[in-house]
Amino acid sequence: MRRNSSLSFQMERPLEEQVQSKWSSSQGRTGTGGSDVLQMQNSEHHGQSIKTQTDSISLEDVAVNFTLEEWALLDPGQRNIYRDVMRATFKNLACIGEKWKDQDIEDEHKNQGRNLRSPMVEALCENKEDCPCGKSTSQIPDLNTNLETPTGLKPCDCSVCGEVFMHQVSLNRHMRSHTEQKPNECHEYGEKPHKCKECGKTFTRSSSIRTHERIHTGEKPYECKECGKAFAFLFSFRNHIRIHTGETPYECKECGKAFRYLTALRRHEKNHTGEKPYKCKQCGKAFIYYQPFLTHERTHTGEKPYECKQCGKAFSCPTYLRSHEKTHTGEKPFVCRECGRAFFSHSSLRKHVKTHTGVQPYTCKKCGEAFKSSSSCEVHERTHFGEKPYECKQCGKAFNSSSYLQLHERVHTGEKTYECKECGKAFLYSTHFRIHERTHTREKPYECKQCGRVFIYFSHLRRHERSHTGVKPCECKQCGKAFTCLNSLKVHKRIHTGERPFQCRQCGKAFSYSKSLHVHERTHSRQKP
């Protein structure tokens, strides 16, 4: 990739000085770069060869690039002058047949799609007027989008709200939000002559239909060098790369949280408004988006339309199916940079990363206990109210989360998909399998920040941490006694219910606690001669 000279320029002087210098330079282009190109054009008319001269002048020689921060410091008048200068420069270069190609991109993605029109060209050549040489500005050579991307320049701004865009096509799409124009209505081009033979969908450009056809052919020309995953579309490929680089360019103005994808930011922003238009009629749970709502409804209906081709297991949503399929391939593409542990899914990696950061932004309103995810906090809050909306159709047992119900259902099916390669032992649940693996590795990944004690299980760490904080969230409704964990509360309740699940095989005597049974069994062993 070509190194951007503006980056080194930025390091040397304050931003205001850089802008002033570049601004003076861009104004000077009307008398330097532009005239040089015109002189070359005139020499061609006189029969002189211009090959050596065009070789000596490139786009970088005659164009001035501003970074996004520098562009923001220019007033509207300066921006308009800059556009006029650059438009003239592009016209002149087009007249002499100058061509621009990003060789790095061509080498990296050969035969992986055509070059796209430069965002700067889109912005500067909105009017299709003719060049002095007789060529139309619409004949300016196509430029690769990466030519402008490194500079951060976004010269297309919305005249209604002032929002700035990299591509003219992005600005056109944005303008529909003001005009309420439907996405499939193309007022700019009118007819859509290119029709897909598979599904009948029509397009304005042949390039658009070629890209669309990949959905039917299954072609995935863009491959990630990090994990080998392939994509049909360039934008999907670029979004995926951010998983490996950790780049989060989209930031919420309300809370400062950053996201990899614009769609994720838009989804997050609705959390601040509190709007949840999709409500489940069965349990009353509300959702911001339709897709999670649809997936949730299937926990009540039992519908599982997505089936694994390997083992026939069915799932309620495609995400669960994709995660499951990796258990067959053994693929774990998501690696923690802190400890090197690998995961099947990106969501699992995100949950794991929080064990290193210690961030627990979600707090129970009832007892004050903090959680790493909103779903965990929501499930926990149900323990206070005794709410268990998810019921097993086999045995009638109820659970406070759909995931617990799904795990429980394996008890009836007897499915044990997770097998230890060390000893061959099989497990119903991936969590039990991972915990078992630590018996071989002796790994204790969970450390108490207060005293440094380490634990094999996260639940043990949480229980231990309460010994420092004194928090006892689990309270007995019978006598009011509080406990640090739910298991201790369950054991305590036997005092009130009289339940004695532990029975002696020798004499049949029953006990409320396993410890009491062990003590009792010793009385039999001592009686033996």
From Swiss-Prot:
Entry-linked InterPro entries: C2H2-ZF_domain (IPR050752), KRAB (IPR001909), KRAB_dom_sf (IPR036051), Znf_C2H2_sf (IPR036236), Znf_C2H2_type (IPR013087)
Q: Where is the KRAB domain?
A: 57-132
Compartment(s):
Nucleus
User: How is this protein annotated for GO cellular component?
Assistant: nucleus
Q: Where are the zinc fingers (C2H2-type)?
A: 156-178, 194-216, 222-244, 250-272, 278-300, 306-328, 334-356, 362-384, 390-412, 418-440, 446-468, 474-496, 502-524
The UniProt entry lists the main location of this chain as nucleus
Signal sequence span per UniProt?
none
Record keywords: DNA-binding, Metal-binding, Nucleus, Repeat, Transcription, Transcription regulation, Zinc, Zinc-finger
Q: What Gene Ontology terms for biological process does this UniProt record contain? A: regulation of transcription by RNA polymerase II
**Transcription among keywords:** yes
Where do the segments described as Disordered lie? 1-53
Citing just one GO molecular function, the answer is: zinc ion binding
* One Pfam family this sequence matches: KRAB
User: Where do transmembrane segments lie in this chain?
Assistant: none
**PROSITE patterns from the UniProt entry:** KRAB, ZINC_FINGER_C2H2_1, ZINC_FINGER_C2H2_2
Q: What does this protein do?
A: May be involved in transcriptional regulation.
Q: Give the family this protein belongs to, as stated in its UniProt record.
A: Belongs to the krueppel C2H2-type zinc-finger protein family.
Q: What is this protein called?
A: Zinc finger protein 490
Which species is this UniProt entry from? Homo sapiens (Human)
